């Protein structure tokens, strides 16, 4: 749950960064992190309001979002191929290495650069996180035993293909390494504006911002359904409130707004520490989600042949695939909690709190908080998932839904 809320925050905050760039070009909107956070608040508010719509409406938005992403990527790539007067060489795109972390004095070889490379995997790993959304929406999916599984697989495949094409196209148009690095958070805007023109940059940013808004809405939907499911199983503090849904549309209203508020607070360090705070939020999202992904994989290994397979399964290959997945998750969870900037290491000369990777604090804090809660309390009464609830609960819920109502009150 921690990872799902954090990834919602990361997506929304990334959207706010791109939206700030667009508004800065259009209206000279301030591009400081305080103003970015203001936009972020409005984006999360909008995501919450849209998630109040009926399920068929949000499903239509998700379908439109998928087409927007695919067509949008093709448009951006096509424009980046045709419009810029100058493109980088293939050797530059696939062979150029840059180290702006301060480690090793900027070296691009040896063990130091290998360390820099590993910490730089964060954003790549972050992009491969949302595929579990299909599972969260399985109760609202036709033929979920097959559809949800294929949704997870295809989301990764599509992300890899379209994401790689987009990254390569952008890299071919990088005008100047030094100035691009100096642009920091707004590096993409700098690349597009310098390689083409302000108007072209505005168009591409508009496409990207709309796509990110769709992602924020979808992630809010996914996180709210996860929180609702956990609450229904009585696994979340205050579950009596969180598992309630609206009478008319059966929307988990309270979990939607709970996710919105928690996601809004997650990247709060960015208010003071800028991009480093946002990057740490992203690391929390990756670590939290992948630990959650790892737990059922471990349980599958433990079950062995006693495990009852579903309609979609890995067959006899599950063992080696599971071990690779577990080892990789353990590895990245360690790497992404390490310092990513030289100035963020306390004993280094010029140490600056603005460069500290604070990821270990909330990650370890969450383990202590929720682990302690389980040891001291939850293990005494939590009996595992409640798939459908008791017969009495089902009868009461269905009776409430069938009763006529004059307004969409909550139950």
Where are these regions (language model features)?
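Transmembrane helix-loop junctions in multi-pass membrane proteins
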Residues: 50-56, 200, 262-281, 302-306, ...
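Membrane-interface loop-to-helix entry segments
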Residues: 36-97, 129, 152-157, 282-295, ...
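Hydrophobic transmembrane alpha-helices that form the core helical bundles
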Residues: 1-44, 48-52, 209-226, 277, ...
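Interfacial loop-to-helix junctions that mark the boundaries of transmembrane helices
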Residues: 26-37, 62-64, 351-359
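TM-loop-TM module centered on a large, flexible mid-protein loop between adjacent transmembrane helices
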Residues: 21-26, 97-108, 151-217, 236-285
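Terminal cytosolic tails of multi-pass membrane transporters
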Residues: 108, 297-321, 339-411
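Helix-loop-helix junctions that connect adjacent transmembrane segments
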Residues: 28-35, 67-202
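Hydrophobic alpha-helical transmembrane segments in multi-pass integral membrane proteins
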Residues: 79-81, 325-342
